[in-house]
UniProtKB/Swiss-Prot annotation:
Mg(2+) binds at residue 257. Binds 2 magnesium ions per tetramer. Disulfide bonds: none annotated. Belongs to the class-II aminoacyl-tRNA synthetase family. Phe-tRNA synthetase alpha subunit type 1 subfamily. This is Phenylalanine--tRNA ligase alpha subunit. It comes from Listeria monocytogenes serotype 4b (strain F2365). GO terms for biological process: phenylalanyl-tRNA aminoacylation. The keyword Aminoacyl-tRNA synthetase applies. It holds the Pfam family Phe_tRNA-synt_N. Its EC number is 6.1.1.20. GO terms for cellular component: cytoplasm. The keyword Nucleotide-binding applies.
């Protein structure tokens, strides 16, 4: 039995030392120290020994059991430490790697179009003029040759706040304010007026109660219709392509005389006629004309000495035509599926 205990101890310690994981180690514990293990069988055989041998062999058997228990416990600590270290190693975060960049917004399609036009006009020597969105009736209408009860006021159903104040229906009041305070000793007036405007329109695919306008104004000595045509030609070719042709049609606006509307040759069909141009080969873009003498005089400008031209267009219409947007409401519904299609490389201010 002594030899049996020593062989068992050596065999068990060897296998315990070679155990590579906790499951194997637990299997060895059950194998050698379990109820059906060899140590249990040896302890059962103690009763067959003589009274002299029994204490000695019992003490030796207990020493072997204690040694194996301690060996298993020691090996368990080693394997648990190795498992923890391996887990920490596999879950280590490399702080030198670049982090996940946050989602950064880019400029909205409408902002891109507005800034493209602003950059073009600034390059032509224009300045940007701004004014209040809550405007006096005088600047919104009367200073623009639209006196009270003028029938043309019916064309712009307005949001009145008080009897004499309203949400501006156009950015033309900025032109009136600019002319009123301008000092011609410092040069001619040459401004564009971008901004939000408001009209009591029913929202649909092509109309909105709030939209944007960019209006332009040039006033100085010897300003002619040819200057207006040249400016509109540059605008059309810059925004819609060098191959674009323009067409000017007579029209009526109370604040300009003569007044014209500008069409551009259809960029979809090349003038042959299609759904975009409604079969005409031309697409209406903006209204314009020479500043009416009455408007100049109401701003304190001598109409016999100074002349000028003005024009106005909607960036929404430009964006819809240029990027084939079929509903103006897409520009205002904040649907990321739509806006992500027109992401610019330049980030916006958030």
């Amino acid at each position: 039995m002594l030899e049996q205990l020593q062989t068992l101890k050596n065999e068990a310690e060897t296998q315990i030392n070679e155990a590579s994981d906790l499951k194997t180690l637990n299997d060895l514990r059950v194998k050698y120290l379990g109820k059906k293990g060899p140590m249990t069988e040896i302890m059962k055989q103690m009763g067959k020994l003589s009274a002299e041998e029994r204490p000695k062999m019992g003490s030796l058997a207990n020493e072997v059991r204690t040694a194996l228990t301690e060996a298993i416990s020691s090996k368990q600590q080693i394997l648990e430490t190795e498992a923890i270290n391996e887990k920490l190693k596999s879950e280590t975060i490399d702080v030198t790697l670049p982090g996940t960049a946050p989602s950064i917004g880019t400029k909205h399609l409408l902002t891109q179009v507005i800034e493209e036009m602003e950059d073009m006009f600034i390059g032509m020597g224009y300045e940007i003029a701004e004014g209040p969105e809550v405007e006096l009736d005088y600047y919104n209408f009367e200073a623009l040759n639209l006196p009270k009860d003028h029938p043309a006021r019916d064309m712009q159903d307005s949001f009145y706040i008080t009897e004499n104040t309203l949400l501006r229906t156009q950015t033309s009041p900025v032109q009136a304010r600019t002319m009123e305070k301008h000092d011609f000793s410092k040069g001619p007036i040459k401004v564009i007026c971008p901004g939000k405007v408001y009209r009591r329109d029913n929202d649909d695919a092509t109309h909105s109660h709030q939209f944007t306008q960019i209006e332009g104004l040039v006033v100085g000595e010897n300003i002619t219709f040819a200057d207006l045509k040249g400016t509109l030609t540059v605008l059309a070719k810059t925004m819609f392509g060098e191959e674009r042709e323009i067409r000017l049609r007579p029209s009526f606006f109370p604040f300009t005389e003569p007044s014209v509307e500008m069409d551009i040759s259809c960029f979809k069909c090349g003038g042959k006629g299609c759904r975009v141009c409604k079969g005409t080969g031309w697409i209406e873009i903006l209204g314009s004309g020479m500043v009416h003498p009455n408007v100049l005089e109401m701003s304190g400008i001598d109409s016999t000495r100074y002349s000028g031209f003005a024009f106005g267009l909607g960036p929404e219409r430009v964006a819809m035509l240029k990027y084939a947007v079929d509903d103006i409401r897409h520009l205002y519904t904040n649907d990321l599926r739509f806006t992500k299609q027109f992401q610019s490389t330049e980030t916006g201010e958030i």
